């Protein structure tokens, strides 16, 4: 295979260092010129300023990330066999995890960390939910779907590429059935002994936050005979886990009544005592201040907010938001209580998040001990050359 088969993206002098370290992104500011014409999503070769071959990737002319790398192997073709290999490699790891942990649902493809930039595939039983978030992923849609069908011949595939980031790639939002039957309105899955209902068609992201699986399990270690507050509860995964861990009472708070209704169903589905579960539709910030003013106290608080920051310009505001909400939570905890707090913002580093929690404790006038650290579950791996893949971080904090 020769370079002449593909248009070439030529890097500016000195901008090849990240590629030599096998980082999969090329930003627009590092590009000197294009040699040859390439449509959005098409395969291109990436070379340094002297023409030395570096990688093969997908062209994204509308994005600040001008190209994403498919392969660093000059002899590897980007064809149907390529996508089948990537999916099979990913499935080998997930199948082992599923057998070990008794799972029927997991993230099959985690984008760059599985060698498929812009591709997310979540499995829920026999339903596979597809998100194609880059121009290259969209261009290879047919090959990706074919590879998935070859690996799982009887699967149903549903597209949830209804994510705003596609607009940055010059793509329209997309959602709907791709292969097989429509998923039911609520699909039951199994996670660490829990039965949980997932809304693939209308739920957050692909329907459920699989990345928090291990954190939900860890919650059980802290809640026996405790009063628990579950903030930003969504469909109640943390609440169900807390009840299975023997909590005395759990209050789940969310702004969505639909999500709270599913949370209630999840408690009932697991045969748990519904009298121990309270469901409150409210704004978490406002409710925490109300609880503080009323003198309410809890033994364990789960703080799992949505992403507060989408770009660097929002980071300072997000830091203030994280500090305020964690300060309020710390104020509501009994001495010896535990705060389980998380950030899913990729721009929020673990060190910065830990500093924010420390600052929140100072503002709350309480001492805090960091006793456990969390990250996304093992079906959401982070390849060493792409640290941005570590987006979810969390701490268990003992409040003195």
Swiss-Prot record:
Catalytic activity as recorded in UniProt: cytidine(1962) in 23S rRNA + S-adenosyl-L-methionine = 5-methylcytidine(1962) in 23S rRNA + S-adenosyl-L-homocysteine + H(+)
GO molecular function (one): rRNA (cytosine) methyltransferase activity
Gene3D superfamilies given in the database record: PUA domain (2.30.130.10), RNA methyltransferase domain (HRMD) like (3.30.750.80), Vaccinia Virus protein VP39 (3.40.50.150)
A Pfam family this chain is assigned to: Methyltrans_SAM
Repeat in keyword set: no
Domain PUA: 6-84
Subcellular location: Cytoplasm
A GO-annotated cellular component: cytoplasm
Superkingdom of source: Bacteria
UniProtKB keywords: Cytoplasm, Methyltransferase, RNA-binding, rRNA processing, S-adenosyl-L-methionine, Transferase
UniProt cross-references to PROSITE patterns, sorted A to Z: PUA
Entry keyword Transmembrane: no
Class of enzymatic activity (EC top level): transferase
EC number annotated for this UniProt entry: 2.1.1.191
Family membership: Belongs to the methyltransferase superfamily. RlmI family.
Annotated HAMAP family: 23SrRNA_methyltr_I
NCBIfam families: PRK15128.1
Task of the protein: Specifically methylates the cytosine at position 1962 (m5C1962) of 23S rRNA.
Protein name as catalogued: Ribosomal RNA large subunit methyltransferase I
Organism: Klebsiella pneumoniae (strain 342)
Primary gene name: rlmI
